[in-house]
Amino acid sequence: MERQLRGIDPAKLNDIVKNALIADEAARHEQAARVEPPPVESQVSTVGDVNAEYYREIGMKATAAGQVGVLLLAGGQGTRLGSSAPKGCYDIQLPSGKSLFHLQAERIAKLQELASQHGAQVIVPWYIMTSGPTREPTETFFREHGFFGLDPANVIFFEQGTLPCISNEGKIMLDEPGKVATAPDGNGGLYAALRAPVREGQPSVLDDLHRRGVKYLHAYGVDNCLVKVGDPVFMGVCIEKQVATGVKVVKKTDPCLLYTSDAADDMQCVD
């Protein structure tokens, strides 16, 4: 426990807890800032857009030049799916029986194949952020499946950090006597994880990006089974607009939400 406590930065932890509790309290009293649509000038729609092919070409050229990488947020376990394995190992009941990791690996392979039409052999490095509970089983799963046909040298595993579990009163919780309870620090832990060595004594992800000449990263969550990994149209828009970050969304066209329930046979609309 002493070793755990020595690794905790009290000032940083206090800031995190304070901000979390303030945000929670504001949400309870509806004091949080209203969410407004982004400015029109910051939006680009590629649905039926004659410029979509133009953006795709930009994205493909960057991919062919080795400037595009893919970053997967895969620290979660499939507990809500009834599985203790990493989410990416989960069989989503497709006829093929392919896991989420398998589907995404195939899409990277296809992207490399398509981009190779614009130049020599193309490599799209795949950076996979795991967590303490998921790193070992994730790496084992990839080895057992031959990295789904990808070159292991271009699949880089790294690990997000952890934070002590804190009560609503701001007190550090114990997992058991003499052991601090900890949990992965969420997707926000990505930025620190990018700077940390992928393994002890090895370079960081940022070092690897620099070595490979990767300028653009497409980041996504592991449970997005429909993701267009390294989508050249999306990457092309971001490159052409010279933006530091971009978000790809499905535009909401109706104020109601459709959902299904085991308790009802009909689709229901909720405002």
Language model features with spans:
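Poly-acidic low-complexity segments
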Residues: 1, 6-9, 151, 230-231, ...
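ATP phosphate-binding P-loop of adenylate-forming
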Residues: 71-76
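Domain-scale recognition of functional cores that engage charged ligands
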Residues: 40-69, 80-264
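Low-complexity, highly charged intrinsically disordered N-terminal segments
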Residues: 1-47
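Positively charged, low-complexity/disordered segments
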Residues: 263-265, 269-271
